[in-house]
Amino acid sequence: MTKHIVLSSLLLIALAIFGGCRTVPYDTSGQNFAVFQFGEFRMLVNTTAPLTFLAAQKAVQQDDLFKTYEVQNKFEAQILARAHNDQKIRINIEEANSRQTLVRIRWGEGGDQIKSRKLFDMIDANLK
């Protein structure tokens, strides 16, 4: 009986640690990768947080999302929005260093990799 408990516990711990993380190839060259972990899409952009925030605001409008909340500080920002099917979208922007900013997108409660990536692509296009 104790072997089953130990084995079950180890299995649950392994699933919690390794189960929710995927590296997603971002481009066809294989040089850039994004991370989709526990329903959250993460990718770096080569610019500052304020410029990324402006690009994210524009992407929210382009994707016809209803913005419910936004806040911006010097090195970080957050935008909350809703889709037409009432799914909650959260965009977190954090400046990693003076030349790179981390963008984290969660689409819905469980996360949607395809829709999150589409929104990130719009943000990235607005930065160019």
PLM feature spans:
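Repetitive helical segments and hydrophobic/amphipathic motifs
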Residues: 12-13
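C-terminal motif of bacterial Sec signal peptides marking the signal peptidase cleavage site
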Residues: 16-20
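Ser/Thr-rich, low-complexity intrinsically disordered terminal regions
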Residues: 22-128
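Bacterial N-terminal signal peptides that target proteins for export
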Residues: 1-9
